[in-house]
Amino acid sequence: MNFWRSLLVFVVLQIMLQVAYAQHNVAINEVPLKSEFQDGRDYFSYRSPIKVDRADERILIQSFFDYDCRVCVNTQDILALYGQINSNNVVVEEYPVATKETPFSAQVYYTLQEMNQSDVSDSLLFETSDAVRYKELAKYENLLKWLAEQNVDTERFDLIYRSDEIKKKFSEAVYRTENYGVFTYPFVVIEGKYVLTNSTLYNDDYTFAVLDFLVHKLSNERENKELQ
């Protein structure tokens, strides 16, 4: 019974992905480059672009999130789907927002990543989208109880959470947050040049369209630079 149920879920997911791809089947290079989206309204530009180093030619989309965020769950889903559909052209990475005064999200996120518990991290993002629930789980003892309910080894979690490696990753997260000028969340950076915030990310169709526009714009800029 479980086999057939799993098979059905797999088939449904494949159909959903094919439908989404069909709706999005205009190739990125065929999207017309025109001023249908405006800087300062639909997206924002860095005055000084941040250098992005990648081994391949794909455009980097960086998503900054916080566990105390009602919109971040939807943003994560939107970007995951966009990344799947456009896997040849873009790569999506996610980072926790961190300041010296707010270590919670970064330390918890990197601890769960170290434990290969990405699914639990996703569940926590959904769980803490409610402000009241976030305040509860932001207390370490309550978080450990919740993690135990998710079958996470809390002793190992605590050991990793307090490790030097996680402290180092937290410091890197603080630097990254400051370097990218993250002032809200969700905060999505495209190739170190353009930024999307909740004013765009609240709607999946809107987000897809603006991303297509910016990815096409960046691709054109690269081609023109190579021709010079």
Where are these regions (language model features)?
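Extracytoplasmic thiol/disulfide redox context detector
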Residues: 6, 19-101, 174, 216-228
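Bacterial N-terminal signal peptides
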Residues: 7-16
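C-terminal cap of thioredoxin/glutaredoxin-like
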Residues: 149-228
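Positively charged n-region of N-terminal signal peptides that target proteins for export
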Residues: 1-5
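Structural alpha/beta surface segment adjacent to cysteine/selenocysteine redox centers
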Residues: 70-148
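Conserved short-loop catalytic and cofactor-binding motifs
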Residues: 67, 96, 131, 158-161, ...
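A broad, low-specificity signal for short, low-complexity segments enriched in glycine/proline
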Residues: 26, 53-56, 69-71, 108, ...
